[in-house]
Curated annotation (Swiss-Prot):
SUPFAM superfamilies: Ribosomal protein S5 domain 2-like (SSF54211), Thioesterase/thiol ester dehydrase-isomerase (SSF54637). Residues 1-302 are annotated as: UDP-3-O-acyl-N-acetylglucosamine deacetylase. Its cofactor is Zn(2+). The gene is lpxC/fabZ. It catalyses: a UDP-3-O-[(3R)-3-hydroxyacyl]-N-acetyl-alpha-D-glucosamine + H2O = a UDP-3-O-[(3R)-3-hydroxyacyl]-alpha-D-glucosamine + acetate; a (3R)-hydroxyacyl-[ACP] = a (2E)-enoyl-[ACP] + H2O. This is Bifunctional enzyme LpxC/FabZ.
Length: 461
């Protein structure tokens, strides 16, 4: 299984804040396992920390603003996108003001610094949320929508549509996060000339200029109005009849605006709190719908906190019944594992098919057959035993004996025709032949029982 990652070392970036115009420095630091993303305002008394999760987003007008107990940090999305796309799970971010510096309006400097300091693998397993069915969020008032579909990896398709002759419908896609650096990171934020005066009047974009945003002039205005706006922006006067991009830097890609919207989607969905395996299809996305979708995903995750393993009956098993018989001393009717379909250093997934011919159904119960709970635990324990035996050389010469079982819960009946899917994982490294494990049994997507085990590996006499 993939492990969590953090930075090998800290790095800092400095620049103007897009909306405040303040000189700001943000520092990204390594963080321990299961820390997640946290942002610390080191300029305030007590240096308060905000969890970087969608539930703490309070404003989305022209960027993503996180708030907690009156403490705010804005314009976080580009830094968050870089962390998420490069697979960083745990990071403490310190900033000396109310927003991240805008830099050049893209995520490329974050990516460069992450690559410079490097990343390191941690002990904890990366906790993916696997999309198993379509999830959709629509905003009928704007025509925006975000859909996520099952997929083996995280990928995105983004469509933007504006009432503009300069930016027609644009499409951007990212099939693999490994391509984020080359295909997305350098895409810059953008603004329409018609939006600049209202934004300035609202006290925003005080640090905006042609070096940190693409500025698009697509609706003709009078030369006088255009000259006044140029004076406010601090740029030379230009011909009001000449529509188009007014930046002195050329576009990185013809569809740079769509690519930047894709970057923003990644940054906002990083606030879900877990990496996703699924394909995102976003139509006319923006920070508002991105955040609403991220909140919906957090609710989905809470509802399905324990996910059943994926079972593909066409894949070759890791262990078939014959190999299991070589490792476990159990025999009919007490060999209760049919096959192992997945196994890593710290986890295992096994299967027991429940048929009407099971001998225990003769007495439990003849008129309403139900698999005894103690046998469900026995089957789970056998799967865990296979995991533990996998940690030693010549496993055929060892047996596993269980010393303690705790936290047993039965949630649903198991009946003939069910397929029991077991997932057992180590809670700590095996020490001196002693292991502690947590196991879940599923029928379909539902947890039917769970338990914790302590076991000892003993060499056979």
């Amino acid at each position: 299984m993939l492990k969590q990652k953090t930075l090998k070392d800290s790095f800092s970036l400095s620049g103007k804040g897009l909306h405040t115009g303040l000189d700001l420095t943000v520092t990204f630091n390594p963080a321990p396992d299961n820390h997640g993303y946290k942002i610390q305002r080191i300029d305030l008394e007590g240096q308060p920390t905000i969890d970087a999760v969608a539930d703490n987003v309070t404003e989305t007008t022209r960027g993503t603003v996180l708030s907690k107990n009156g403490v705010k940090v804005s314009t976080v999305e580009h830094g968050m996108a870089a962390l998420y796309a490069l697979g960083i799970d745990n990071c403490l971010i310190q900033v000396n003001g109310p927003e991240f510096p805008i830099l050049d309006g893209s995520a490329q400097y974050y990516v460069q610094e992450i690559e410079r300091v490097g990343t390191e693998e941690q002990s904890a397993v990366k906790d993916f949320y696997i999309i198993k069915s379509k999830i959709e969020f629509r905003d009928e008032s704007t025509g925006s929508s975000i859909i996520v579909l099952p997929d083996e990896n995280f990928s995105l398709n983004v469509l933007v549509s504006y009432d503009s002759t300069i930016i027609p419908n644009q499409f951007a896609t990212l099939e693999d996060m490994h391509n984020f650096k080359d295909e997305v990171a350098a895409s810059r934020t953008f603004v329409f000339v018609r939006e600049i005066e209202p934004l300035l009047s609202a006290g925003l974009i005080k640090g905006g200029d042609l070096d940190n945003a693409i500025v698009i002039y697509e609706r003709k205005m009078s030369q006088e109005s255009y000259d006044k706006l140029a004076d406010v922006m601090g740029v030379p006067h230009m011909d009001a009849d000449q529509l188009g991009y007014i930046n002195h830097k050329p576009l990185v890609w013809p569809n740079e605006c769509a690519r930047h919207k894709l970057l923003d989607v990644i940054g906002d969905l990083a606030l879900i709190g877990k990496p996703i395996k699924g394909r995102i299809i976003a139509t006319r996305p923006g920070h508002t719908i991105n955040n609403k979708f991220a909140r919906q995903m957090r609710k989905e995750i809470r509802l399905h906190e324990i996910q059943a393993p994926t079972y593909d009956c066409n894949r070759e098993p890791v262990m078939d019944v014959n190999r299991i018989r070589e490792l476990l001393p159990h025999r009919y009717p007490f060999q209760l594992v049919d096959k192992v379909i997945e196994m890593g250093a710290s986890y295992i997934v096994g299967i027991k098919n429940i048929t009407a011919n099971e001998p225990f159904f003769q007495g439990h119960f003849p008129q309403e057959p139900v698999m005894p709970g103690v046998l469900q635990i026995e089957a789970m324990a056998q799967v865990g035993g296979l995991l533990v035996l996998n940690s030693v050389d010549e496993p055929e010469r060892y047996s596993t004996y269980f010393m303690k079982i705790d936290g047993v819960k039965f949630r649903q009946k198991v009946v003939p025709g069910d397929t029991l899917l077991f997932r057992v994982e180590l809670l700590a490294p095996i020490r001196r032949g002693i292991s502690t494990m947590k196991g879940y049994a599923f029928v379909g997507e539902k947890v039917v029982c769970e338990a914790e085990f302590m076991a000892q590996i003993v060499k056979n006499k």
